[in-house]
Structure formats: structure tokens, C-alpha cells
Amino acid sequence: MAKKNIKQKKDNRIAIDVKKHIKKVDVGVFDGTFVFTSPLSISELAPKLNKSPNEIIMRYFKKGVVYNLNTILDEEQIGELCLEYDLDFKIEKNVNTENLLENIYFDDLEIDLVARAPIVTIMGHVDHGKTTLLDTIRKSSITASEAGGITQHIGAYQIIKDNRAITFIDTPGHEAFTEMRARGANLTDIVILVVAADDGIKMQTEEAIDHAKAANVPIIVFVNKMDKYEANPEKVLNQLSAKEIVAEELGGDVVFVKGSALKNEGISELLDSILLIAELNNYKANPNRLAYGTTIEANLDKGHGPLATLLVQNGTLRKGDYLVVGSTYGKIRNMFDEYDNEIEIALPSKPVKVSGFEEVPTAGDKFLALADEKQARAIANDVKQKKMRLERAMLQSSDIRTKIANGELKNINLIIKADVQGSLEALKGIFSSINIEGVTTTLIRSAIGTISESDVRLAQTSDAIIIGFNVRASRIIKDLADSVGVQIMNYDIIYKFKEDLELWMKGTLDPIIIEEVIGEAKVLKLFKHSQVGTICGCRVINGKIKRNALVRVLRDGIVIYNSKIATLQHNKDSVNEVIADKECGLTIANFNDIKENDIIEVYIKVEKKHDEVK
């Protein structure tokens, strides 16, 4: 039987014009304005300003600052210099395929735009009920939680209220996830700030407020745990008012909803408030475009390979689309909604799980659907090349490398493998939060997936510790690591890793030398001896003094000499130590200018680890 010709439906979605987005900025003075893109060295800047390098160097020299041709001036310095030359200045950005995804813009006509679901981010302090609230909204009994009691991974979900969709982004609640929360706020239209009525605002509450303000988005405050006996909503209102989050009932413009996520109280009112704000702000997108959006989460899935949760921000995503996501690309093989139902299309504001990537994407990366695979691959490769250049530049940082080589700076090499991108990002964020003078950490490799032979071999050659977060090494890999002396550390709680890293960093430093005073003696009488010099007749006034111990000679409370005890006698017998309230005779090495009533302070030097020093 002859096969019927099945007519493929034409794809009318508009593709991004990549060439139109590419922009090369001409650096120079135009109509009294100096246009530039980034920090410049004096040798690069001078001709662009129509000045000689020596003139600029002399200008700084007169201010008491010594610069040379290779000195890099930052954007602020260049701006100040322009003003000194009576020039306006303007900072523009070169756009090429390496940074294209961060610089996508849309020139859609109003007629092409349609209403989309509001994107809502739930934020708040740990244990104030964010996850419970989200689970109650979804009418789900499943709460994904970390071993340490922290929501493990960012998730995105869509629910329906009165036939209208609302998309929620859930962000972890602990301080280690500050960057992840910040990224969530940048994606969002509305922030729900969860504050426990029995606890009030806390550190993460204030951080969330800062992120919401920075993103310039409306805030709805959900005063949770109103079912608690200790609930004090007035306290919460007053605390937030002090942070310029003023409730409508106090004359402000912020919606406050009081309720209990645990008992499903106030939830309907909260959703109504979201829909009202969405209606007032008229959120729109153009579904007739190839999709553009942001990676919420990514991991290596056993069944599907590299898997990413994507949030469509504009356009429509379809199964079979070619995507570039940061430094990787692929063709959508499978697409699932938040309930793991396989779907064919995703409209604006829809979160979906997508498989088909060459590598695991990075959470926070922008994605773009393109008309063909060749273009997607080319852009991804350019982004990857830029990433590799930056990594090489970091490794070749002469300042750090020189200090390490000279022993001025201690270093710990780490290889991190994690279950999902969100965990990896949080672990990497730990590095920047720990600042211990004299020691640094170098991240040799960080990736999603199990610990491999390649990781062990790299750790062996780079003298690195392997960190596995929610991933384990097989018995074969463990045996290999043991045989070559590579240490593998496993964690499932972020802050246990932080504590250990701090201990490792302190442990690499040379011990701190602490001086401990063990005794004091007062000089009562002096005796001159032709062979040994001045002998001090002393009484030990506290502690004890020991032969060969270090001493400070104090006169009227001022140290006049540092030396050590050369000889020590008690009742004409040579002894090793003399205790308090006993008299003794002693000599001080290389010092004879001692006087009666001088105090001899005896001390020892003790090595202590950095974590032992308060």
C-alpha cells in the first residue's frame, strides 16, 4: 500500500536575526563624547582621546599617583579623566556570538503580544515556610528537602487559578544560595516574601528584600504561621515598614496576606493578589517567535542524559527545536512539564524539563532556539572558547602563582562533582564567602556527574582533593584513589563542606606562634662574676622560671632587653626550674646591664593551629 503524503505544518515562528544583534563599538571621541566599551590601558586610551600617553601619565603623577603605559584604567577612572578633558563619556557594549545570549532584545509590535502568566518567585528566611507554601499551592504532599533541612534545588512550577496560569520559582532559603536567589529575582515579575508571624524578619528576609528591590518588581508579603500561638503580625508589619516595605493598611502600596501555609489559610487570597497585580501590570510576550529564556536547573539524568529545566520568557518552545544554552547546544529530544508529562510545546512563562543537550547546561544560562543546528553549534563553541580563555587567564594569574611558588600564599586544589548544577553553583559560591589571609583555593574542575577515573588522575597530578556532593565513587574508583593517594570527600549538606573547607584552609597555613608567659622574677640583688658576668639574685613572684627559657627584662614596665636564661641556680645547685616564692640566682645571656627591682618575664613560644586561636 502506498504511503500517504503527510503535510508538515509550516513553522511561522520568527527567528532572532543574529547579525542584527552583533554590534562592534567604535572607541573614540564623537561630538564631544568619548565612547568606550571596557577598561583600557593608558597606551590604548591615549590615542583614542587624541592625547599622548605621557600627558596622561603626568596628569596622574601630579596627583601623586605613579602609572605607566601598561596601567589599566577602569571605567570610573576613564570617566573622571574624560570630565577633566571636558568630555562627556558613554559606556557601550560590544556584542558578538560570545555574549549574544546575554544581549538579546525584541522589537515586537504591540499587535503581536499576548498576555502571559506572571512569573512569581517565593523568597524568605530558612524555616519560614516557603516550601510548605509552594507545596500547599500545588496541593502536593511532597517536599524536596536537603539532609540539612534546606530546600535542595531550585524548581519551577505552573498552577492554574480561575483558568489563569501562574508560574512559581522556588529558591532555596539558606545564605549559601544568595546568588541563586538573586538570579531568581531577575527572572521574576512578582516576589512573594514569606515571613513567619512568630519569628519576624531575619537575615535572609533582608537579602530577599534587597534582591526584589534590585529587580524592581512588585512584592507581596505572605505573613505565614498565623496559626501559631506566638504569632505577632503587627511586629512583622512594623519591621518591614522600617525596611520601606509598607503595607496598604499602613498607607503603603505593598499587599500583605496573612495566613498559614500548613493549614491552607490565606492561599486563595494570595493567588488572587498575584492575579490582580498581573492584570495591572499587563505581562505580555510574543508566542510567534522561536523561544528565548533562562536555565533554572540542570543535572545529568540516568535515563535522559543532560537534562535542564528551562523557563520560556518569550516565544514558543517546541520538541525538535535546536537550542544553544550557554556553552552547549542540542536538539530537544524530550520535553516534560513539572509533573513529568511529556509535552510538545511550551508557551511564554512555561517551565519545562528538556533533554537532548551535548553537555549539562549551567543554571542561570540564557537559552535561545535557532533555526538550524549549525548556527546553534557555532554560537555554543564561541561561548565555550571564551570560557576556556577566562579559565586559562585565571590559572595563569602571575600574582597568585608567584605567591604560591614563593611560599607566601598557601593553596588548596579542589575537584568538585555534584548531582545537579544548583548544588555545584552553591558549592562554588562557598569559596568566595571564605576569606582566610594567606591561603587560597583553586577549583581545578567542577562538573555534574559521578566521580570518574579522569577525576582521580587529574587529582593525582594536581595534588587535589575530590569533593562529591550527593554523588559517590564506585568501588573501583575508590580503590584507584586509595592506590594513588587521592582523597575523596563525600557530602550531602552544604555547610558541612563549608566548615571542613575552612579547617583545611587554616590547616595549610604555617602554625601561629603564640608567646605564653610562664613566670616572673624580681631582681633583689646583683653580684659581679669575672667569668659569667652579672648574676641576678631573684625571687620568683609567680609561675616558674626555667633554664634556657626566653626572657624579657622590664624596667618600670618597659621592655629593655630580650634574651634567654643562661644559668639557673637554687641554693648553689644548678637546677632546671624554680617555682613561685623561691629564690634563685640566674644570668641572662649577653646582658649585664641589669638593675635591682627589674622584672624578668619568662616565656615560651607555642605553635598553635589557626582554628585554635581565638
From Swiss-Prot:
Keyword check for Cytoplasm: yes
Note one Pfam family from the annotation: GTP_EFTU
Question: Which branch of life, at top level?
Answer: Bacteria
Residues binding GTP: 124-131, 170-174, 224-227
GO terms assigned for molecular function: GTP binding; GTPase activity; translation initiation factor activity
Q: Where is this region: G1?
A: 124-131
Where does it live in the cell? Cytoplasm
Q: Looking at the record, which segments are called G2?
A: 149-153
Q: Which residues form the tr-type G domain?
A: 115-283
Query: Sorted alphabetically, which PROSITE patterns does this protein's record hold?
Result: G_TR_2
Choose one Gene Ontology CC annotation of this protein and give it.
cytosol
The ranges of region (G3) come to: 170-173
In this chain, the stretch annotated as G4 covers 224-227
Note down the stretches annotated as region G5: 260-262
Its keywords, alphabetically, are: Cytoplasm, GTP-binding, Initiation factor, Nucleotide-binding, Protein biosynthesis
Task performed by this protein: One of the essential components for the initiation of protein synthesis. Protects formylmethionyl-tRNA from spontaneous hydrolysis and promotes its binding to the 30S ribosomal subunits. Also involved in the hydrolysis of GTP during the formation of the 70S ribosomal complex.
| Family that this chain belongs to | Belongs to the TRAFAC class translation factor GTPase superfamily. Classic translation factor GTPase family. IF-2 subfamily.
Q: What is this protein called?
A: Translation initiation factor IF-2
Organism, scientific name: Ureaplasma parvum serovar 3 (strain ATCC 700970)
Instruction: Name the encoding gene, please.
Output: infB
